[in-house]
């Protein structure tokens, strides 16, 4: 309790402490901030208050200085936008994070670079297991060329040569960060450096000399102090003294401009002979930047109003000049090889979480539940256990024991379980209560970040207690052996908020069969979902699902459908065939509801307009979609309104539904079907 702690230790309330601390910060830093220009830029390209997003980075100005490209998260994805130099025209060129060959844009090491003619730009994205160098049209975003770099662990910071025939980049391989030059026509990858020093930020001058930042020196055990180096095609020479940490590098009129720490923030300095000319004076730091061919237009990414924003400077003027020697206060760190003994890793488990509860009932006696999770130090092995039990009958307890092997690209799941379920028997002649004791093994193989194959096999031993439909026990018990096979495929590139997906798509298709049993059947099913976000909090959501059970005992293993709102409390549809269609328009309903009594505040209540339709049926029933008069025949449908309030782990959902056959309401308008429950958006 922070308030009680403050009262006891400092003898002041939280409110008084907050006020005094705020005054102390102002007294300490306001005089310091007066030495900086808070808003010295000329044009602000991005603004989180208008566009949304908090991370706008890697701006690159075209050689002509008339436009720029940058990476932004304004749509919650990492996208590449083009903008006029005034910021009035902006357009999305590349959508990131939604397909296997554009998994991510390496936001912590991102760089975009225009070709010399300004018609194209280069960028790097993560593909399915390797990095890809892209060249795209700077006005349409069309991908013109893509070069996978499967021989390297990663690539960063692409930079066009003045003739547009080569691209310099940083390549990562076996723990090394080295400079490479990629020849576009021949696809030859030329290695410029080959050592354990860190080489970053390659860029060309107009004569074709390659500049980059590096901590290379005569002692391989010293690192962390950077200088600018120049490669003329034959040899590498140091162009500046060591200057500590260099945060970025670009060229202006064939002179290096570096982002350096100065007075506890990061500003830009142009290297001119033996001098450093400071050309920015911001308090919050500049993290990446670029110049046009003339050097008169500069785009930069800086911290502004709580976000990383892109701004434009027009002909940035010198702020002051420092002797380069007086600035070289960086120091090397010395790596000292350590003596160690190598031992083979042994798997050892420790408990990560444990939860449980217990109680006593005069009807059942002692009862409780327990769940716990254990893993090894590397996270490659997991064991998860969950159970409930009743003291009077431990043999009928429910439990699940899972072992997860996560070391390889493919994952394995071994499971042993016992649980109870409700089913059917002898073509729906009886209702069954089944005790399922069994085990299974599943293998998961991800093709990429979005697509996965699942395959498995298992065995269930069912003890089936048969009941009549009125709930009377028949006295009959059936024992069934069910070995099964399973195959599934899933796709998911949806963007998730805490309460559910808001953009993208999800799809799953699976098949399961019991080939050798007294309960033989085969099942196929699919579920596809698509989300269209038309504005930040306004979403159209659609879902279509369906399936079919085949085989001798198809009627004993039906689908049970309850996803048609308005009908789910009044009827349960089951059969060996089913389909469900759900559609919603989701929107903010109440941003804040403040009640006088009880004194509570409900924040961000969301709303949705929905239409649902679906049904499940047996082959013997027959199925007809429409009646002769155009109304629904077999399917059931409803429309209505839904309100949702997220409480941290689930939504409290209130549905108001009117049932319809598409010609008329099946319920009076004033008597809809209400449902109140916990859940999440599909």
Regions found by a protein language model. Give the residues of each.
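Transmembrane beta-strands of outer-membrane beta-barrel pores
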Residues: 216, 359-362, 376, 387-391, ...
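Repeated loop/turn-to-beta-strand initiation elements of outer-membrane beta-barrel proteins
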Residues: 89, 188, 378-383, 407-414, ...
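Conserved beta-propeller blade repeats
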Residues: 51-71, 89-90, 97-124, 143-170, ...
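Feature captures outer-membrane beta-barrel proteins of Gram-negative bacteria and organelles
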Residues: 368-376, 397-416, 435-447, 483-493, ...
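Outer-membrane beta-barrel initiation region
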Residues: 308, 314-409, 413, 477-501, ...
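Beta-propeller blade-edge and WD-like acidic-aromatic loop motif
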Residues: 34-40, 74-96, 119-120, 124-147, ...
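Beta/coil-rich, acidic/histidine-enriched accessory regions frequently appended to metallopeptidases
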Residues: 2-103, 107-112, 138
């Amino acid at each position: 309790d922070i308030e009680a702690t403050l009262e006891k230790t400092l003898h002041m309330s939280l409110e008084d402490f907050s006020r005094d601390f705020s005054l102390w910060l102002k007294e300490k830093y306001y005089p310091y901030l007066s030495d900086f220009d808070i808003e010295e830029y000329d044009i602000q390209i991005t603004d989180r208050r208008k566009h949304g997003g908090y991370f706008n980075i890697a701006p690159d100005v075209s050689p002509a200085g008339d436009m720029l490209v940058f990476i932004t998260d304004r749509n919650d994805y990492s996208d590449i936008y083009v903008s006029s130099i005034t910021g009035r025209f902006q357009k999305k060129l590349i959508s990131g994070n939604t397909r296997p060959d554009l998994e991510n844009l390496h936001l912590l090491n991102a760089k975009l670079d225009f070709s010399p003619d300004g018609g194209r730009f280069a960028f790097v994205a993560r593909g399915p297991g390797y990095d890809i160098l892209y060249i795209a049209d700077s006005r349409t975003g069309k991908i013109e060329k893509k070069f996978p770099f499967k021989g390297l662990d990663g690539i960063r910071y692409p930079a066009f040569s003045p003739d547009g025939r080569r691209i310099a980049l940083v390549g990562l391989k076996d723990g090394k960060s080295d400079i490479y030059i990629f020849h576009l026509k021949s696809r030859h990858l030329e290695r410029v450096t080959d050592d354990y020093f860190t080489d970053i930020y390659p860029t060309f001058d107009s004569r074709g000399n390659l500049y980059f930042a590096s901590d290379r020196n005569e002692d391989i055990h010293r690192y962390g102090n950077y200088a600018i180096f120049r490669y003329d095609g034959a040899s590498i020479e140091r162009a500046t003294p060591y200057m500590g940490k260099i945060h970025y590098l670009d060229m202006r009129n064939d002179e290096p401009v570096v982002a350096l720490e100065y007075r506890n923030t990061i500003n830009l300095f142009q290297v001119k002979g033996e001098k450093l000319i400071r050309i920015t004076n911001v308090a919050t730091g500049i993290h990446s930047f670029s110049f046009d061919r003339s050097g008169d237009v500069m785009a930069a990414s800086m911290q502004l109003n709580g976000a990383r924003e892109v701004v434009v400077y027009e002909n940035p003027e010198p702020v002051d000049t420092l002797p380069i020697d007086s600035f070289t206060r960086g120091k090397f760190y010395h790596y000292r090889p350590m003596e160690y003994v190598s031992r083979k890793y042994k798997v050892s488990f420790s408990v990560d979480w444990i939860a449980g509860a217990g109680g006593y009932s005069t009807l059942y006696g002692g009862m409780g539940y327990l769940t716990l999770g254990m893993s090894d130090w590397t996270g490659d092995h997991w064991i998860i256990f969950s159970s409930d039990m009743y003291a009077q009958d431990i043999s009928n307890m429910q439990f699940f024991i899972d072992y997860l092997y996560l070391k390889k690209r493919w994952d394995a799941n071994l499971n042993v379980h016992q649980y109870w379920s409700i089913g059917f028997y002898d073509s729906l002649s009886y209702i069954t209560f089944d005790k399922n004791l069994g085990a299974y093994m599943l293998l998961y193989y991800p093709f990429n970040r979005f697509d996965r194959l699942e395959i498995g096999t298992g065995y269930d031993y069912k003890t089936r207690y048969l009941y009549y439909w009125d709930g009377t026990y028949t006295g009959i018990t059936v024992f069934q052996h069910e070995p099964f096979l399973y195959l599934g495929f899933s796709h998911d590139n949806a963007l998730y908020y805490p309460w559910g997906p808001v953009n993208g798509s999800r799809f799953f298709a699976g098949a399961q069969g019991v080939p050798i049993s007294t309960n033989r059947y085969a099942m196929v099913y699919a579920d596809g979902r698509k989300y269209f976000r038309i504005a930040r909090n306004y979403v159209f959501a659609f879902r279509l699902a369906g399936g079919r059970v085949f085989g001798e005992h198809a009627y004993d293993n039906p689908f049970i459908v309850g996803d048609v709102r308005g009908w789910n409390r009044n009827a349960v549809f089951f059969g060996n065939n089913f389909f469900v269609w759900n559609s919603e328009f989701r929107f903010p309903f109440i941003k804040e509801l403040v009640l006088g009594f009880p004194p509570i505040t409900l924040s961000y209540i969301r709303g949705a307009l929905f239409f649902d339709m679906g049904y499940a049926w047996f082959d013997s029933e027959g199925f007809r979609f429409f009646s002769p008069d155009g109304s629904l025949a077999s399917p059931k449908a409803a429309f209505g309104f839904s309100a949702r309030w997220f409480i941290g782990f689930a939504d409290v959902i209130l549905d108001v539904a009117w049932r319809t056959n598409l010609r008329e309401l099946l319920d009076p308008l004033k008597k809809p079907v209400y449902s109140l429950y916990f859940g999440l958006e599909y």
